[in-house]
Amino acid sequence: NYQAPIRLIKQVAERNCKIRLVQLSSLVALCPHPYLAAYSASKAALQTYCLALQEELRLKGSEMRVCLYILGPVRTAIFPPELQNALGGSQLQMSQEIAARRIIGLLQQGRSYAIVGKRYRLLAWLMKLLPQRWIIRLIGAYLRKGL
């Protein structure tokens, strides 16, 4: 989740091509999730790298753009069924098709950073209101039900 994308981004950046590189991140980058510690850390590192690189490229006058889009849970096979159920099952997860359509829309609008989906933007906003420790405890209790 971190090393391979960074290596690829560096190789493309060295060529200074006129290209938009799309990198997907996750809400876990904004608030670490218990039971997903390594995933949370890798997404946070990748997100931080991309945000810093966006500014570096802008200051250099590079034609390359790094677009960073943050997603909440998307219906994929990445998580075991028990954890998917703990994440609210399919009703709380965005479909892959909707996620793809929204990302394409953001690219067409020229947006280089966004939290994809109203529900997930609301969650990110709410996470700013409470102390992070409280949020981590709530998420841990919620996820533990599915393990």
Predicted region positions:
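C-terminal helical subdomain
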Residues: L68, A86-A124
